Amino acid sequence: MESGGEGMNPVYEKLCACYESIRARIPFTPEIALVLGSGLGNYASKMEVVERIPYGDIAGFPVSTAPGHVGQFVFGYVEGAPIVAMQGRVHYYEGYDMTDVVLPIRLMKMMGAEILFLTNAAGGIRQGFSAGDLMLITGQIATFVP
């Protein structure tokens, strides 16, 4: 991944810069990317952890201001599967540009992840849902992502 060059997309250039700043610290090619939403940050303790990379160590990477968000990538294994997990993430409501909000997902793809699990705290009006239930997203509105 080379950054720079005439006419390169600035979003892609920033992505490449983030990747280059941590490439040597990535211990393996992750197959699975996991975003640990509110209340799930401790899931990383169930992993066989190999490396932790704080977001602040990544050149140009957005850092969360939300309370309780650790702000690091955790590389490790769960039942033999190589995983990169995000402990904390940035949110659009924190004032970040949407390109920064989605940058971590694009970075995990650049690391090699082919499977993505997104988790978050959510509310719903459907009767029968209880705290801790899993809900599957069947559609999304992606009008903000450039």
Indicate residue ranges for each PLM-predicted region.
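Metabolite-binding pocket within alpha/beta catalytic cores that recognizes anionic/polar moieties
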Residues: G7-P146
